[in-house]
Swiss-Prot record:
This is Theta defensin subunit B. There is a cross-link at R1 (Cyclopeptide (Arg-Cys) (interchain with C-9 in subunit A)). PhTD-1 has antimicrobial activity. In low salt conditions PhTD-1 has antibacterial activity against the Gram-negative bacterium E.coli ML35p (MIC=1.5 uM), the Gram-positive bacteria L.monocytogenes EGD (MIC=1.6 uM) and methicillin-resistant S.aureus ATCC 33591 (MIC=2.5 uM), and the fungus C.albicans 820 (MIC=1.6 uM). At high physiological salt concentrations the antimicrobial activity of PhTD-1 decreases slightly: E.coli ML35p (MIC=2.0 uM), L.monocytogenes EGD (MIC=1.7 uM), S.aureus ATCC 33591 (MIC=3.6 uM), and C.albicans 820 (MIC=6.5 uM). It comes from Papio hamadryas (Hamadryas baboon). The keyword Disulfide bond applies. It comes from the Eukaryota. There is a cross-link at C9 (Cyclopeptide (Cys-Arg) (interchain with R-1 in subunit A)). Forms a cyclic peptide with subunit A (PhTD-1). An additional intersubunit disulfide bond is formed. Belongs to the alpha-defensin family. Theta subfamily. The keyword Glycosyltransferase does not apply. GO terms for biological process: defense response to bacterium; defense response to fungus; killing of cells of another organism. Disulfide bonds join C4-C9.
Amino acid sequence: RCVCRRGVC
């Protein structure tokens, strides 16, 4: 799955 974290998806 795609999760946006620390500016990265």
